[in-house]
């Protein structure tokens, strides 16, 4: 909208156009112009053709009879608008120039051909548009408030669910802790029971041996005394003495009974499996809850030209037609392999892959060291910096040197990998059956990366999560 220089807002009484003083006790003459009542005598002149007086407006030169009633002008509140050029109150609005006009502005040449109307009439379309916009804004505001209310309700539902899940987690782990504590107490009680049986059988053994030692001691003493007797006395009871001198075979009792030894041996075997059971439980729990250090993706800079990666870098498949890719010291060119990202130099990490084996093809899953060979023929063993399992339709084997055939109950269609850097372990499980596949032990130095390879058309590998 163009500027409106003809408009000013009056913050004090407007000035009279005759005396230039404050327009106090103002009156409006018939032509519509306003002056101070004290200035009216200056407007009076004798009419040329009448005996009466006339009022001559100095602004529009219109003549009126002096007897014509003059309307007092109630001065509006501070802030009324007046024409800056003529000092007159604003009554009109020019649609073409979007300007406020007084009487003189309306009659001037500038706005003769323009669409000019009274303020109340001109403002109505604008008021209608404003009301329409106001209704639209009110509707939009109401809709936003409704959406906000709905979202707040959803948020409250989610918060309630979270609070419920927190309680469930606390309850589950408290129950688990109680069960573990109960099992711990049972194991310790069983160990104490075995310990008491050992001490009991030891006491029984000592008692038997002590009794036999005492009996033999008494017999030795008796025989020593017999040896000191004269021949006549000794020969009197020769048959009795000879009977006493005969050696009786002493069956030495066992300190621990074979039955107790078997119980201890069986319990010892159970205890030996406890750490492995706890480790597997921890891994299964972490995997089930998807507690991991981050998302694993495939590194396109390392991918062989025989591999096609998905846009999200979560899936890779084999292709017979090698892709045209820039050469890089990081890229595998002898094996259809690719590394995962990121690499790890500490901590415990887990990831899972789903396998799709093509006809006569297969997949390799595991980890590889940062310095693994990328160019030309490469081996798959710990000496080559690779700890992985090779899976095909017919068999599965570990990349040891020499390779280790793995007689699994079924060929995995998904593999879960658990890396414990500090412990130097890489453990692989069947993701569907939880059956252990193989555990590598190593002494890592530098970063290790998730390692994957696929071969033959139709073979595909997809990272989960």
Curated annotation (Swiss-Prot):
Enzyme class: transferase
Binding site for Zn(2+): 83, 86, 105, 111
Gene Ontology MF annotations: molecular sequestering activity; transcription coactivator activity; ubiquitin protein ligase activity; zinc ion binding
Main localization (coarse): cytoplasm
Keywords: Cell junction, Coiled coil, Cytoplasm, Metal-binding, Nucleus, Transferase, Ubl conjugation pathway, Zinc, Zinc-finger
GO biological process: innate immune response; mesodermal cell fate determination; negative regulation of intracellular transport of viral material; negative regulation of non-canonical NF-kappaB signal transduction; positive regulation of DNA-binding transcription factor activity; positive regulation of NF-kappaB transcription factor activity; positive regulation of RIG-I signaling pathway; positive regulation of type I interferon production
Disulfide bonds: none
Zinc finger feature spans (RING-type): 16-61
Localization of this protein: Cytoplasm; Nucleus; Cell junction, Focal adhesion
Enzyme Commission number, as recorded: 2.3.2.27
Induction: By TNF-alpha.
SUPFAM superfamilies: B-box zinc-binding domain, Concanavalin A-like lectins/glucanases, RING/U-box
InterPro entries in alphabetical order: B30.2/SPRY (IPR001870), B30.2/SPRY_sf (IPR043136), Butyrophylin_SPRY (IPR003879), ConA-like_dom_sf (IPR013320), PRY (IPR006574), SPRY_dom (IPR003877), TRIM/RBCC (IPR050143), Znf_B-box (IPR000315)
Pfam family, one: zf-C3HC4
Domain B30.2/SPRY: 276-465
Coiled-coil ranges per UniProt: 126-229
General function of this protein: E3 ubiquitin ligase that plays a role in several processes including innate antiviral immnity, cell migration and chemotaxis. Acts as a 'Lys-63'-specific ubiquitin ligase for MAPK1/ERK2 and MAPK3/ERK1, promoting their activation by facilitating their interaction with MAP2K1 and MAP2K2. Also plays a role in cell migration and chemotaxis by acting as a stable focal adhesion component upon recruitment by multi-adapter protein paxillin/PXN. Functions in the RIGI-mediated interferon induction pathway upstream or at the level of MAVS.
Subunit structure: Interacts with paxillin/PXN; this interaction recruits TRIM15 to focal adhesions. Interacts with TRIM8; this interaction prevents TRIM8 cytoplasmic translocation.
Family, similarity comment: Belongs to the TRIM/RBCC family.
Protein name (Swiss-Prot/TrEMBL): E3 ubiquitin-protein ligase TRIM15
UniProt organism field: Homo sapiens
Gene name per UniProt: TRIM15
